[in-house]
Amino acid sequence: MVFLLTALHLSTFLLREMYQIADIFEDHFAIVLFLWSLFLIPSVAVPFMSTRIARDGLLAFNVEHMKVAQVIVQVSRLLRARQTLRTLRFVAEMKIHLRENVRRNNEQVMLNVEEKPQVPLPQAPRRRSSIIPIDATATFKAARRRSSTHLDPLVTAGVLRSIQQTPLPLPVASKATFEPPLSPLAAYLTPRKQRGDAYRREMERREIHTIFCLFDVDGSVCYSQ
């Protein structure tokens, strides 16, 4: 339609307007040339601009050019890099969470140990000349028979001390050890898988660097958000 209207305008100018302008301004040839150029500008500019607009429209609404392998590869890389950034953020938050939990547990254990009463250390038993074990009950009965009316307080205290069971020291909770989580790529079955994982990590590093360069507009190697 645009080309038909342009052709109609050009034919009208060539067959009618051109001779009328020449008859009206026959004494001023410069004015005639100027008017002719003004009438010819639409006939030249409209086809050129229409061709350019049609080409851009075809490229914009063409779906086939979106199926190029390079475009798909770039989109997949961006998606994997975005997923990698989310994974790294999750790992960092999990490490901070685990460290806070370990520190809080250590502080609680130390506080519980300080609040508990200190247990006296058991005295080392004296060596006996005989290897036969001495029955504390028999010793107490013999001392009672020796003094039927009055018990020796020293002997009684020694017997009671031997009868009573020495309380065992409370076990002190061992200090909790914290190990950072290992990467799922830490264990390799074959050297080929190890090389493949190294290649994959290098590709992810390059993709993350590419995305970071998009944020780092001013070149300060940092971004606020």
From Swiss-Prot:
Signal peptide: 1-18
Location of the protein in the cell: Secreted; Host cell; Membrane
Paired cysteines (S-S): none
Short motif RxLR, span: 77-80
Claim: tRNA processing is one of the keywords in the record: no
A single GO cellular-component term on record: extracellular region
Membrane topology: Single-pass type I membrane protein
Highest taxon above the source species: Eukaryota
Residue stretches spanning the membrane: 29-49
Coarse class of the protein's main subcellular location: secreted
Swiss-Prot/TrEMBL keywords: Membrane, Secreted, Signal, Transmembrane, Transmembrane helix, Virulence
The keyword tRNA processing is assigned to this record: no
Family: Belongs to the RxLR effector family.
Domain notes: Has the canonical translocation RxLR motif, but lacks the canonical EER motif, which characterizes most oomycete effectors identified so far.
Function: Secreted effector that completely suppresses the host cell death induced by cell death-inducing proteins.
Annotated protein name in UniProt: Secreted RxLR effector protein 160
